[in-house]
A protein has these predicted regions:
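Hydrophobic alpha-helical membrane-association signature
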Residues: 32-35, 83-86, 116, 189, ...
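Glycine- (often His-adjacent) and acidic-residue-rich active-site loop
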Residues: 56-93, 109, 139, 222
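Conserved CoA-thioester-binding segment of acyl-CoA-metabolizing enzymes
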Residues: 1-57, 92
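Short, charged, surface-exposed hinge/linker loops at domain edges
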Residues: 212-221
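Crotonase-fold acyl-CoA enzyme core
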Residues: 92-208, 231, 235, 239-240, ...
Length: 261
């Protein structure tokens, strides 16, 4: 399927989605938002794809909302809600996507651009990456899940500081506060991310989907509910062909060949 604002590449079980508006630092216009949702729908149906990498073209991840389109005319409250709900559908889809997702961040990831990175399961950043909840600078509030996602990574107090000051932080600070998983030199960003994605893609797809769902759910339920979820997940995993293959491979001292069944 062709997209106007997105490049999609699939190799060795890894689908790379590249936001492709480099002239606008990959600002999230309506076309980009539509393309992102459609791409996830397409990739979910592809059994050969096991991991998704989300990134941006031209040396930046995403500058967030398209400020130029905002400046073109004043939007009504109803129009504003419609635009945000389109973004929110993508972030919710991304967070709950059954396949593992990795944000590969170079350059700016600010505003909604920061929040779609936070919606991924992991963030690998280059040493020149910048992150920020900057919407207060233009009289707006965080959207795209920023109020929910950010505090779960960095804590409520730090999240409030980032939002209310609209400060942009560098990659080293993002790593220090737990916003990102790893920071690597820019020249190593793609290789590092692909190595991580490849390692995950080589694992059991069914168990990965179940484990991701359990971890997401556990963040908002008590221990008893989390334990019940684990019992349900394990009852599905233990009866799978992948589990049998994993046990055989362990006993035979070889690499397993998981099929997602």
């Amino acid at each position: 399927m062709g997209y106007k604002a997105l490049l999609v590449d699939r190799v060795d079980g890894i689908a790379t989605l590249t936001m492709n508006r480099p002239e606008a630092r990959n600002a999230l216009d309506i076309q980009m938002r539509e393309d992102l949702v459609s791409a996830l729908d397409e990739i979910e149906r592809d059994p050969a794809t096991r991991v998704v990498v989300l990134t941006g073209a031209g040396g930046h991840f995403s500058a967030g909302g398209d400020v130029k389109s905002m400046a073109a005319r004043r939007h009504s409250a109803a129009e504003g809600r419609e635009r945000v709900e389109m973004l929110n559908r993508f972030v919710l889809r991304l967070f709950n996507f059954p396949k593992p997702t990795i944000a590969m961040v170079d350059g700016f990831a600010v505003g909604a651009g920061c929040n779609i990175a936070l919606g991924c399961d992991m963030i690998i950043a280059s040493d020149r990456a910048k992150f920020g909840e900057v919407l207060l600078k233009i009289g707006l509030v965080p959207d795209g899940g920023g109020t929910w996602l950010l505090q779960r990574l960095v804590g409520l107090a730090k999240a409030k500081e980032m939002v209310l000051t609209a400060e942009i932080i560098d990659a080293a600070e993002a790593l220090r506060i737990g916003l990102v998983n790893r920071v690597v030199p820019a020249v190593e960003l793609e290789a590092t991310t692909r190595a991580l994605a490849g390692r995950i893609a080589a694992g059991p797809p069914l168990a990965a989907t179940l484990a991701k769902s359990l971890l997401n759910r556990a963040a908002t339920v008590d221990l008893a509910a989390a334990l019940e979820g684990e019992a349900f997940g394990q009852s599905n995993a233990i009866s799978s062909e992948d589990h049998a293959e994993g046990v055989r491979a362990f006993l035979e001292k070889r690499a397993p060949k998981f099929q997602g069944r």
